[in-house]
């Protein structure tokens, strides 16, 4: 969905924070992001590391609210370890797009996995390690 169509105001706050760390048209780097500056959202935030060849995504941090909702903590695990393979494939595709386009992306997801009948929004924000290491 277009970023401006997000319904969750918390996501707008996180997006504003990310944009504030963007200097001179470059993506904010991982070192620019300080989780202590958005403590109010930490339980809802996942931080992922991007691995190359093959392209994989590994949870550096799985937010506690998300882990509780899903029934397991993915911290330290790759997305392909998610038991529900359609969800793993969806996540991989969405995150791969963020990496390829070097731009934020928003999604509204309706799911019957975990909590039946749940709809939620996801905001994915790229933060490479260095300006030269982004694929």
Feature-to-residue mapping (PLM):
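Intrinsically disordered, low-complexity terminal regulatory regions
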Residues: 1-82, 89-135
């Amino acid at each position: 969905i277009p970023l401006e169509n997000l319904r969750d105001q918390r996501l707008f706050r996180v997006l504003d924070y990310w944009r504030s760390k963007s200097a001179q048209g470059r993506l904010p780097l991982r070192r620019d992001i300080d989780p202590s500056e958005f403590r109010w959202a930490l339980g809802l935030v996942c931080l992922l590391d991007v691995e190359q060849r093959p392209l994989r995504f590994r949870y550096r941090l799985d937010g506690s609210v998300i882990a509780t909702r899903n029934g397991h903590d993915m911290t330290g695990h790759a997305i392909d370890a998610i038991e529900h393979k359609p969800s793993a494939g969806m996540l991989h595709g969405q995150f791969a797009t963020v990496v390829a386009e070097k731009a934020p992306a928003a999604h509204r997801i309706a799911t019957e996995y975990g909590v039946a009948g749940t709809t939620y929004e996801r905001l994915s924000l790229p933060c490479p390690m260095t300006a030269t290491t982004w694929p």
